[in-house]
Structures are given as C-alpha cells and as structure tokens.
Amino acid sequence: MNSRESDAAMPFPPPKHRRLKRAGLIALAVVIGYAILAYLALPAVWTHYEHQKGLAELPMVTRTAQGIPGDPINVGLVGDNKDVLCAMHAAGWYPADPITLKSSIEIAGSVLLDRPYRDAPVSNLYYLGRREDLAFEKPDGRSADHRHHVRFWKVLDQGEEKRPVWLGDAAFDKSVGASRYTGAVTHHIDADVDAERKFLATDLQAAGMVEAKYQVTGVGPTMAGRNGGGDLYYTDGEVWILRLVEACRKRTGPAIVIPSPAATEIKDQIWQAVAGTLRK
C-alpha cells in the first residue's frame, strides 16, 4: 500500500467547527437538564402543604412599602388572636410599639445612648398588600439595635385544625444602618433566618405554648437571598407551623412533631450540611 492509499484509509478528524458545535450542544443539554432538575423536578418533589392545604397558593415573601421583596416567611402559628398574644407573652416576647414620632425618638435614643427599649417599633412590611397585624420582639443586650423580632399576618380564618392561621417573618436585628436600596435608616438582620425561626419556636415550646409543630414549604432553599434593606439571608426554605395551646392552657409535655414527607426530610438533611459551611 503506497502512502497515498494509506492516507486515504485513515479517518480524518471532524472539522473544528463541528467539534465546537457538538461541545456546545452538550453544554446546552447540561444547562437545560440542570435547570429542569433544580427549578422544576426537585421543587416539585419537596413542595408540600399536606398539613395546611390553604397555604399552597400564598406567596412566601414579604414586601416593603416600595414593593421590594422583604424578609422571607419562615414561621406560622395556629390559634386565635388571644392565643397568639398569650403565647408570645408567656415566651417573654413584647408587643412592638407602633411607629410614631414619639416611638421613633425613643428608639433613636435607645440606640445612640445604649439604653433599653424592650417594645421598640419594628419597620413595617407588607404581605398580601397589608401591613403586619401583630409584631413582637425580645431584647438581646441593652439597646434596641440588637433584638429578636417577628411580624405576623393572619392569612386563614380557619385552617386544617378549624382555627385561624398566621404567617410570620422571624429575624434577628444585629445592627442599625442605612438601607442599601433606599438609604433610609433601618435595622440590618443576621443572615441565618432559620436560626431565628428556631429561637422563637424554642421559646414558645419552653413556655408550654405549643401543642404540635410541622413544616410547609416556604420560599424554598435559598443561599443568597436579599431582603428589603439589601441584607443577605439564607434559609432551607421551610415554614415551621406551631399549633398553639388554646385558652393559654400550658402544655406539660413536649410538642407533638408531625413529620414532613421523606423527600423533604432528605432535602433538609442535605441543607444542614450546606448551611454549616455558610455559618463559618
């Protein structure tokens, strides 16, 4: 076989543009597959409202007065208005004062002079177009620049338990500063909003105010969310629903834990490993 015949028998590599096209198609397929898995398939698997079906169509993030997405919804209560007020009082949380000229001056004095103001006002957020129905806080340190706080909105007159259902946004105020979006003076929150959700739930359970607890889907797993002040937050995306005792009758035993679907339990375990790296 001469050299010309040998060259003819050897396969030629595909043209460069064909290889690039093939690589591009593979990359596109990977991106599409990832998008389907991350944004459609997995959320469909772990989205669940079996314990409180009336929440399935509701948004799970608050809004500022300017319409900017605010804090995520991460906690809920089951009980009437008196049940909520009694439970929060028993847990050592104080109703927040309304925002007035007097309360604004007082909170400024608390922050600047490092003096207590245990029922300082919280900034208004909106859910379903309305301001919070109730707001509570628990001091952490001397002044109002460090505090635990939560807002609640009544969203169902009658849930699965035939009692009212409230949704809330629990967060920890770590400092006072300017909003990254509007420049207004506001509190900046700690990024770990799940920790604050747990803090509130622990307080209510320790006070004997919780009959049972379970989860429903909230905003979904979020590693780099931003609230209305531009603060970063991360969350497993679940809402902890706490069924309160009725008529302030203290529960002596631990709260009943109603499990989530298996897919959600697995997702939560994976998230705990991820969140551990975010906390470092």
Language-model segments: residues:
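N-terminal Lys/Arg-rich, disordered targeting/topogenic segments
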Residues: M1-A23
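Compositionally biased P/S/T/G-rich terminal and signal peptide-adjacent segments
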Residues: A44-A65
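Terminal, regulation- and interaction-focused segments at domain boundaries
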Residues: P59-L85
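Extracytoplasmic/periplasmic/luminal assembly and interaction segments
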Residues: G76-Y117
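A cross-kingdom signal targeting lumenal/periplasmic-facing segments of multi-pass membrane
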Residues: I107-R279
